[in-house]
Amino acid sequence: MIEVGIVGGTGYTGMELLRLVARHPKLRLAEITSRAEAGTRVDELVPALEGAVDNVFTAPDTERLSRCDVVFFATPNGIAMESAPALLEAGCRVIDLGADFRLRDPAVWTEWYGMSHSCPELLEEAVYGLPEANRDALPGARLVANPGCYPTAVALGLLPLLEAGALADGPVVADCKSGVSGAGRAAKVATLFCEANEGFKAYGASGHRHLPEIEQTLARVAGAPVDVTFVPHLVPMTRGMQATLHVVVDRPLDELEALYRQRYADEPFVHLVASGGHPETRWVRGTNHCRIGLHQPPGRPDRAVILSVIDNLTKGAAGQAVQNLNRMFGLEETAGLEGLAYVP
């Protein structure tokens, strides 16, 4: 069994990690940390895990964590980079679900996250953990930067176009919507029920932290800069994410569909819906799947609208982290991630 540690187990992402690790056939939860809940049984805080997890939260301790084979960081930005060097030195692998190792340029990190990077020497080594685009770099990796939720939905929606050079010159617009769990579990006025329910709003329109990550990811695939207009929105649902992508293309819809079907034919978690279909977030709820729909506006053969839906907590965070772990340790990529959404 692979010994797993989770740093930050009380947020929504950490709780989703707990759920996935608990049911994984090859993982054993060795350490689960929380400064605020140290000494509390996990199943007292998360009753849904009673009978599956009998661990007790402990305060973060590098020496204890270093005995694990791999440690997940489900922590606020800036935490993982303080602990990762010591864990790596001890031979422990690290998967960071935060943003500490996603951006290659430390100056760009500082610009968007407002703090200096404490271990910029590790940025080049960190593997960007989007398996569908970077699968071969994951086996044996010591340090993996788990992608953000919005970058995941956008990248999966555009990968086939970029790889085939089918994206023509013109604007790329990423109009994205997320459930409220994407804002985290900490109490904030904007995410109180009476504030978020029966409302719909954009945020970060003048600059969101996921923008440089999106552009960096797309540029890596395209081999050239890709300028993106990215506007996220908050919708009154708990979990789920949709990226509606408006692009200029060089081929008709039937050729685009053939391109996407061929590209994702062997991907266990990415699926193109039936021609003319509109994927829904509830179709992927609680799963590691992404479902994609393709459309072309009438009379505009040079335009395409791509619909990409994921669960922000699973494929957008914890599920993708487990998928990365599976690749790192030579397991079946789908291990512990089987299952479809529950509907209705």
UniProtKB/Swiss-Prot annotation:
Q: Which GO terms describe its cellular component?
A: cytoplasm
Task: Check the record and name the SMART domains matching this protein.
Answer: Semialdhyde_dh
Pathway-wise, it operates in:
Amino-acid biosynthesis; L-arginine biosynthesis; N(2)-acetyl-L-ornithine from L-glutamate: step 3/4
Q: Give the UniProt subcellular location, in the record's own words.
A: Cytoplasm
Catalysed reaction equations from the record? N-acetyl-L-glutamate 5-semialdehyde + phosphate + NADP(+) = N-acetyl-L-glutamyl 5-phosphate + NADPH + H(+)
Disulfide linkages recorded for this protein, renumbered to the chain, are none
Pfam families found in the cross-reference section? Semialdhyde_dh (PF01118), Semialdhyde_dhC_1 (PF22698)
Question: Which residues catalyse the reaction?
Answer: C149
Q: Which residue ranges run through the membrane?
A: none
The residues forming a coiled coil are none
Q: What is its EC number?
A: 1.2.1.38
Write out the GO MF terms.
N-acetyl-gamma-glutamyl-phosphate reductase activity; NAD binding; NADP+ binding
Q: Which InterPro entries match?
A: AGPR_AS, AGPR_type-1, NAD(P)-bd_dom_sf, NAGSA_dehydrogenase, Semialdehyde_DH_NAD-bd
What are the record keywords, sorted? Answer: Amino-acid biosynthesis, Arginine biosynthesis, Cytoplasm, NADP, Oxidoreductase
Q: Which GO terms describe its biological process?
A: L-arginine biosynthetic process
List the HAMAP family: ArgC_type1
Q: Which NCBIfam families match?
A: argC
Please report which protein family the annotation says this sequence is part of: Belongs to the NAGSA dehydrogenase family. Type 1 subfamily.
Q: What does this protein do?
A: Catalyzes the NADPH-dependent reduction of N-acetyl-5-glutamyl phosphate to yield N-acetyl-L-glutamate 5-semialdehyde.
Q: What is this protein called?
A: N-acetyl-gamma-glutamyl-phosphate reductase
**What taxonomic lineage is listed for the species of origin?**
Bacteria, Pseudomonadati, Pseudomonadota, Gammaproteobacteria, Chromatiales
